[in-house]
Amino acid sequence: MDFSSTRMLAQGLFVFLMLSTMAEATKPRTILVGDSQGWRAGTNYTQWAIQNSPFHINDTLVFKYPPPGNSTVTQSVYLLPNLWSYITCEFRGAKLLGNASEGDDEGFKVALNESKPYYFASAEGNSYDCLAGLTKFIAVPSTRSTTS
């Protein structure tokens, strides 16, 4: 094989690897909220969300937490309707996504199907954690880019 053939082969391999990487980058992610620790009281999920962003349309969040009786603090997950509800930890009008027992085993999944803010929070403990800025976060998925 001469130099030009080797060079063309190397360039072709490079293009293939780049396209493979781009295709991988365009796949929706499944993201465990809180990583290996899961969804638990007293945790700053805003910091977690910053570290795990950007979120993209069709990504899926997985919420896992111990069932009642295995934890000193019961957990739940709500989707709050707007920023004001999120800031004030007002759960009227919120949608319960997962009650105290639904985070067990494999947890439950929430698909981020729209380009809009998703306001997640726990209402447990009279919303103490939420009011302290804990056990809540915002995810704003964007369109996944196919170019670098």
Give the residues covered by each predicted segment.
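Loop/turn positions that initiate beta-strands
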Residues: 57-58
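Extracellular/periplasmic metallocenter environments
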Residues: 2-11, 19-40, 47, 68-69, ...
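Short beta-strand segments of immunoglobulin-like
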Residues: 44-54
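Beta-strand signatures of extracellular beta-sandwich domains
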Residues: 76-79
